[in-house]
């Protein structure tokens, strides 16, 4: 069993009826990058080997139990749309769970929204694609606004 789950006292659960033996343990606290041989090979083959250290650190983050929990929370607590405030004023506000905001913040901090444009070079798109692949395994929904931001720059550059 997973050490994180085993550390919880069994008496905490009043319905201690049986031991679950037909399910695998939780996949967490591992390095998503170094644990993915195909991804590591693709990054090397396509010119992103310079980013392997950074990708390994990012893989530790995305594979951690606490970070995976953010993805669970972002999906469990769906966005809420408020049309009016408590005084009846129209606000049209979408409220997201704080976990969603943390996922967005991390995406931006790690350049998923723009890194090949802000730091161009050989393998820049490969490194960004690998980070995006790792991060969307945690939670994919936040990838839409991140990808739209990333995709907007080439279009904007075509404008006179």
Region spans (language model):
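Extended, charge-enriched "interface" segments that sit outside catalytic cores
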Residues: 1-121
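Glycine-rich flavin
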Residues: 96-160
């Amino acid at each position: 069993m997973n050490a994180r789950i085993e550390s919880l006292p069994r008496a905490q659960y009043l319905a201690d009826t049986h031991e679950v033996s037909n399910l695998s343990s939780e996949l967490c606290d591992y390095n998503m990058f170094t644990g993915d041989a195909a991804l590591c090979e693709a990054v090397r083959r396509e010119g992103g080997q310079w980013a392997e250290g950074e990708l390994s650190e990012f893989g530790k983050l995305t594979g951690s139990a606490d970070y995976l929990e953010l993805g669970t929370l972002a999906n469990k607590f769906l966005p809420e749309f408020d049309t009016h405030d408590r005084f009846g004023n129209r606000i049209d506000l979408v409220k997201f769970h704080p976990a969603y905001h943390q996922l967005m913040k991390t995406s931006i901090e790690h350049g998923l929204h723009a890194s090949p444009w802000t730091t161009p070079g050989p393998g820049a798109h490969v490194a960004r694609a690998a980070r995006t692949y790792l991060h969307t395994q945690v939670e994919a929904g936040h990838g839409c606004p991140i990808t739209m931001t990333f995709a907007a720059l080439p279009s904007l550059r075509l404008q006179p």
